[in-house]
Amino acid sequence: MVGLSIFVVWTPALQSQQDPQTAEGYAITHSTTVQACSRCHTVDDQDRMSRISYLRKTPEGWQTSVRRMVALHDVNVSPEQARDIVRYLSNEQGLAPEELRPGLFEVERRLIEHDYEGDSAVEFTCIQCHSMGRVITQRRTQDEWALLMATHRGLYPLVDRQAFRGNACTGQPGCEENLEGQSNHPMDRAINHLGEVFPLLTPEWSAWSANKRPPQLEGEWVISGYEPGEGPIYGTLTIKATESGTDAFTSSSRYVYAESGLTVERSGQGLVYTGYQWRGRSNPGTADELREVMFIERDQQRMSGRWFSGAYDEIGPDVTLQRIGAAPIVTGVYPQALRRGETTEVTIYGGSLSDTRDGAGLDFGPGVSIGMIEQSETDELVVQLTIDADAALGARDFFAFESTLEDAIIVHDGIDRIVVTPESGMARVGGANFPKGYQTFEAIGYNNGPDNENGTDDDLKLGRVNVSWSLEEYTATFGDDDIDFVGSINSKGIFTPALDGVNTDRTGDRNNIGDVWVLATYLTQEGRELRARAHLLVTVPLYMRFEPWRPIGPANNQRLIG
């Protein structure tokens, strides 16, 4: 006889599902959402749906929820219906700009060390499985935070042993707060904190909801950005509205990598959620497809964010867009670091630049002489600059075309040290069953500055320098041999990890994971050798992730991430 067992997930502070008498909660008036979700999410007499009406999230957050419903609960929705649901919920139950800004790193897919300024014990509870970015880009009622905690425990039972039981923060730095009068249970503390700090109803969302309107983005924009491993980029982007809606656009861009001179042309589509969140793709379906996440400022004259690709979203530039109008815009000068006593050809990038045949209107400050103007276009100006032999060390602002660019150039007398960034990197083995996760390193040159002392506040950051790259063993145990198995680094500083899975050539049939030093070596004009290094952890793939960018289903004979 087969017994029937009932598993109940209990969470401290969990009350009955949303109190029908509460004033909180949003009516769901979108027929596709109601039709697709009402099988499990009940609708009350105010058109509020259980769970759904009591939270607000980013487009990525809503898309992850829809994907989870499809994957785990066999919700039958077409891709078009799923997109429609995400669009509706993101617009009607999204985040205000002020609410999202602290969590932009999450939606921009940045691998950073984030320091949560709130309760460190709650942070410790949450970051055992995901970043705090996942948390701070949501708003919920206190009951809904408790239900989310129960959902975690039901779907991922191991969290009880990882963080949800006992005082998980004991002994951790920053977790010494006075707990008198509080529950010592991590879940109680998290629910109370999150319900107070990230509630459903906020003044910011009330104000933005009343002010939200269709974005007016059509026109020409100048691009300035920076891609690790490639350097600064400059160009233009054209946005056009489509007939499919007031929040849908097409884009076409042309930009140049200033360091290499490589010119790139892209075309794509974008949607704007919640009135200010650009989500797009350029060159879709190709090997060089980029996903686009940008934050549109309130004046709709500027937007910024990240364009990225890669299995772990690890490749791509940071970008800033400024709308081109009648007034000239100067976005950058390359090269930026100019040595005393030398003449250098530089390119000034921007938009609506005036036709200039002499240097009388160009002002780079004291100690900088304007030479021959070799090219003058509306988006770039090529000119010869000579730095006086006795020019003062430091940054110079650029004044021209009734426009200003702060720290346009850096006057220096040589490179005194280099630094490898990031100081700590992470790559993921892959290529057999899971995709590889790459890590890009750069060497940044520094000058000691006016005081000629290393590591002081007046040091001058000179930008990327051309170095030779190599790996060294990060010795953690006797006979450590990680360097022989983890992977390799190329001349551009891009680390490629080895295959995932068991390696029979390695002692103990271990995986190709481990720690190494990434070493950069630079030879100065004077023949001195400068060296710097960074730590690299080569770890396992992400075996399970509800990734909103990827389809549900196998592809390319590789297992899903998610």
Can you annotate each of these PLM segments?
Residues 30, 42-72, 131-158, 265:
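Gly/Gly-Pro-rich "capping" loops immediately C-terminal to redox-active cysteine motifs
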Residues 74-104, 158, 163-209, 520:
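C-terminal capping alpha-helices of c-type cytochrome domains
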Residues 34-45, 85, 122-134:
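The canonical Cys-X-X-Cys-His
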Residues 340-402, 463-466, 476-477, 483-486, ...:
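Immunoglobulin-like IPT/TIG beta-sandwich domains and homologous Ig-like subdomains
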Residues 88, 448-483, 528, 532:
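Short, well-ordered beta-strand segments
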Residues 14-33, 72-74, 96-120, 209-210:
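Electrostatic cytochrome c docking/interface patches
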Residues 322-361, 405-455, 542-562:
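Beta-strand/beta-sandwich contexts
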Residues 211, 215-299, 304-315:
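Central antiparallel beta-sheet cores of small beta-barrel/beta-sandwich binding domains
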